[in-house]
UniProtKB/Swiss-Prot annotation:
This is N(4)-bis(aminopropyl)spermidine synthase. The gene is bpsA. The lineage of its organism: Bacteria, Thermotogati, Deinococcota, Deinococci, Thermales. Involved in the biosynthesis of branched-chain polyamines, which support the growth of thermophiles under high-temperature conditions. Catalyzes the sequential condensation of spermidine with the aminopropyl groups of decarboxylated S-adenosylmethionines to produce N(4)-bis(aminopropyl)spermidine via N(4)-aminopropylspermidine. Disulfide bonds: none annotated. Pathway: Amine and polyamine biosynthesis. Keywords: Cytoplasm, Polyamine biosynthesis, Transferase.
Amino acid sequence: MNKEALVQVAEEVRRATGLPVGWRDVERTLGALRATRDLWEAVRLSRVPLRFLVPIWEGLARRGLLRVEEGLDLLAEVPAPRPGEAACPACEGRGLVGERLPGRAAERFLAWAKERPEAIQDFDQGYVTPESTLARVALAWNWGDLEGKEVLVLGDDDLTGLAAALTGLPKRVVVLDADPRIVRFLERAAKAEGLPLEAHVHDLREPLPEAWVHAFHTFFTDPVEGPLGLQAFVGRGLLALEGEGCAGYVGLTHVEASLAKWADFQRFLLENGAVITELRDGFHVYENWGYIEQMRAWPWLPVKRRPEKPWYTSALIRLELLRRADLENARVEGDLQDEEATY
């Protein structure tokens, strides 16, 4: 397929779905299919949102280029570049390893992580590997965003707050999570380890209590990636930061977020005085969750097969404030997980 044909496929998908699909999305889709016939690996390698991939696959099948049976099989040679995989095996491409955190933080965290509550769909949960969590905390340590700092974690099925507290570096760690199981688990771990860690049940659609507004130096969050979810999670994080020089760590995917959404997110940050200082793609690797057949995307998939290895990843973005973010501390109305609102 030449570029003209790629553009044609993208335009057809845009007309049929209203999604901002570009010709590079089609090219990356084809490149991933050159590398694998496994649906989940194709999702990971393409870096294209799943909502885009399904209609692109359908368009390729109509053209006789793709056969969908037990896997995704290309039926013709295409000039799309095959995605390279040259990540360092020691750090899995992250550029740092959590095992170098101070003291016994990594050892103690790995022990506690084995006891964490199971991810459930009620709270749209899915947790990253322990190595991903430790590496995230290590990056914050590298930037001086832990030692002596007040740290806030917004949603914590990954146990980032626990990993940070176990380093012995933060002055205080506060975790907000809607799942009472997570809160009880963190309270038990904090008591057993003697940590300056507190956890609270809090629905991020609700305003932050005034005591938490402009009260922290660092926040961590992996937001629900619908437009309202980004507003609720990242907006609350910015509002919680004290002001200039404070930092946030945010996970953002390609599976659920198009480059158009990434652009809107970057504009949102700039409008609120935040600048991106680090962006490490594929930093977080997610464990496969047990409820995958119940996830919203399952009915769309042309091949109904559970993944055999991790496939869902997200980038880690570090942001820093140039000024205090004065966002409205109001209730966020609507469904944070609204699939039809994602793009």
